[in-house]
Amino acid sequence: MKHDESKNTFKHNNIRIAVVQVGLYFEKGGNTTDFFNDLIKFIDKNPDVDSIVFSENNVFSFKTPYNKELAEKLLQDIKNSNLQQKISFFLSFNGYKEFNNVVTLYIFKNNTHLNQKKALIPFIEKRGLFNRESNINSVYYQIYDSHVNKSFRVKDSSVSTFICYDALFPEVTKKNSEVILIQSNYRLLDKGFGHDKLKYLATYLARFLNGMQSKVIINIQNYGGTVVLYDNWRINNDIYEKSKNEPFIIVDLDIK
């Protein structure tokens, strides 16, 4: 992905991120049989990827037998490919094993960690106005108060993750990360006209609330329209337009 160097200070190939817009892949005719093979082909065509980041999605989940099978197959495919030895993964699951919340699953080498969604929509994502216990087979999720979300390192840069609307609520304990990844699914809010502006405004607000010290925010959208916002408040429109039609895209960053 080429950028106009006269307009920003970002160079190429410091951190290379492969963005996977899961919903758009299937909307464009992709299928569960070919999904991982298509991703591998994309990585082969775009060498030196440091991280692969999935959108929030409704495909990979442990809440139904069918989706659990897809989730377990994805994890096994990653393990068999051995990609996690050189590429860090930021996956997205609706529930993970018995952990009944929307999560980011970080995998790199022998390290794994779950970051959970901290802002659940009442009566839709959680049972009522307050946080209540729900098992993995429930249609609802729960927040685990004792679970600690953490930040990560990609090469020499710090990376924080948020899940969709989480990024619109200021964290009590700030993690000043250089890169913020937001795994989103705004499909329910897509009413046509104004949807592009909504994604822009949400990303600006996320930067204001949680990323004022960050170099870049990447708001990964499930059905396309991923927003890359730099520290000078400039959005990369080339990436945004490309991401509307291509499920897999590359974002090259220099965090120096």
Residue ranges and their predicted role:
Residues N100-P170, K174, K244, I255:
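Active-site catalytic loop in hydrolytic enzyme cores
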Residues N13, N101, V148, N222-G224:
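Residues that flank catalytic or metal-binding motifs in active/ligand-binding sites
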Residues H3-I121:
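Soluble catalytic regions of membrane-associated enzymes that act on cell-envelope
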Residues Y66-F90, K97, S158-V159, I163-I249, ...:
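CN hydrolase (nitrilase-like) catalytic-core segments centered on the catalytic cysteine
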Residues T9, V22, S157, N185-Y186:
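Residue-level marker of positions within ordered structural domains that often coincide
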Residues F36, D145, K199-T203:
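A structural signal for well-ordered alpha-helical scaffolds and beta->alpha junctions
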Residues T9-N13, I124-G128, F152, V179, ...:
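Active-site regions of metal-assisted phosphoester/phosphodiester hydrolases
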Residues N8-K11, S81, S151-R153, F208-G211:
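Short, conserved catalytic or adaptor-binding loops enriched in Gly and charged residues
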